[in-house]
Swiss-Prot record:
GO cellular component terms, semicolon-separated: plasma membrane
Family designation: Belongs to the binding-protein-dependent transport system permease family. UgpAE subfamily.
Keywords from the UniProt entry: Cell inner membrane, Cell membrane, Membrane, Transmembrane, Transmembrane helix, Transport
This protein's name: sn-glycerol-3-phosphate transport system permease protein UgpA
NCBIfam families linked: PRK10561.1
Gene3D superfamilies: MetI-like
GO BP, one annotated term: transmembrane transport
Domain ABC transmembrane type-1 intervals: 76-284
UniProt-annotated location(s): Cell inner membrane
Membrane-spanning intervals of the chain: 12-32, 81-101, 110-130, 157-177, 208-228, 263-283
Subunit structure: The complex is composed of two ATP-binding proteins (UgpC), two transmembrane proteins (UgpA and UgpE) and a solute-binding protein (UgpB).
Gene name in the database record: ugpA
InterPro entries: MetI-like, MetI-like_sf, UgpAE/MalFG_permease
PROSITE patterns per record: ABC_TM1
Length: 295
């Protein structure tokens, strides 16, 4: 089947049509990235009135800073927990829809509710439930002799921000997994059932391979979400504490730039984070995507 390219009467019309998107991209993406790169090579006074070119000194200082290296590894752990937990839990709930006969519509609606909640509100909600003195969940844990105080325990603080972040993202993942599972031809599932395959075997041998492209897409989306969009959760829940136990790269950039007024260090950190995300995305699309294609 042959396809024909669109023909425009004016040679400038195609450029005019893409101009709005190009302008938005330049103003809100390329320009800020260029300024961040420029400031990362400067030594800037706290008020931004004067600067001096220092080359790569900011990056050298950065990787000799133990607090920055700690936030680097904290980001890796946090992103891994949020991405893996979010995908597994969402896939589990999406697979349960097939086995819920009564109230399936109510179940689906209930699963979509977290997506309507702002990230900061989601964090505050779980702070109330995990409040060391009056929280409902902490009271329940105390009945079993478990003392909860995320303001003093770094492990509990990490669990809280991961839990709140996963809960906020679960609706998005659930929606895509549910749509992918529903798109699988029922004839394949029925044929496997006739051959004697149980529900678990049918899921791992048929459903899971067929939804691999959607899983890969959600892997990339959740990784970006964990790197950037969880900032409101961390800020509202722990403010990066205790003792910087939940300070991720994006939160340290905010703290250095807006609280510490160190624009050069903040810009250098943002460049490192951008480079890290680009590398991870390229690796995923280059090596992981090739393993999820199917005929």
């Amino acid at each position: 089947m042959s396809s024909s390219r669109p023909v425009f009467r004016s040679r400038w019309l195609p450029y005019l049509l893409v101009a709005p998107q190009l302008i938005i991209t330049v103003i809100f993406f390329i320009w800020p990235a260029g300024e961040a790169l420029w400031y990362s090579l400067q030594s800037v006074d706290p008020f931004g009135f004067s600067s001096q070119f220092v080359g790569l000194d900011n990056f050298v200082t950065l990787f000799h800073d133990s607090y920055y290296l700690d936030s680097f590894w904290t980001t890796i752990k946090f992103s891994t927990f949020v991405t893996v937990s979010g995908l597994l839990v969402s896939l589990f709930f999406a697979a349960l829809v097939e086995y819920i006969v009564r109230g399936s519509r109510f179940y689906q609606t209930l699963m979509l509710l977290p997506y309507a909640v702002a990230p900061a509100v989601a964090a505050v909600l779980w702070i109330f439930l995990f409040n060391p003195g009056r929280g409902l969940i902490t009271h329940f844990l105390a009945e079993f002799g478990y003392d909860w105080n995320h303001a003093q325990n770094s492990g509990q603080a990490m669990f809280l921000v991961v839990f709140a972040s996963v809960w906020k993202q679960i609706s998005y993942n659930f929606l895509f997994f549910y749509a992918a599972l529903q798109s699988i031809p029922r004839s394949l599932i029925e044929a496997a059932a006739i051959d004697g395959a149980g529900p678990i075997r049918r899921f791992f041998k048929i459903a899971l391979p067929l939804i691999a492209p959607v899983s890969f897409f959600l892997l990339v989306v959740n990784l970006v979400y964990a790197f950037f969009d969880t900032f409101p959760v961390i800020d509202a829940a722990t403010s990066g504490g205790p003792v910087q136990a939940t300070t991720t790269l994006i939160y340290k950039i905010y703290r250095e730039g807006f609280t510490g007024l160190d624009l050069a260090s903040s810009a250098a950190q943002s460049m490192v984070l951008m480079f890290l995300v680009i590398v991870l995305t390229v690796v995923q699309f280059r090596y992981v995507e090739s393993k999820v294609r199917y005929q």
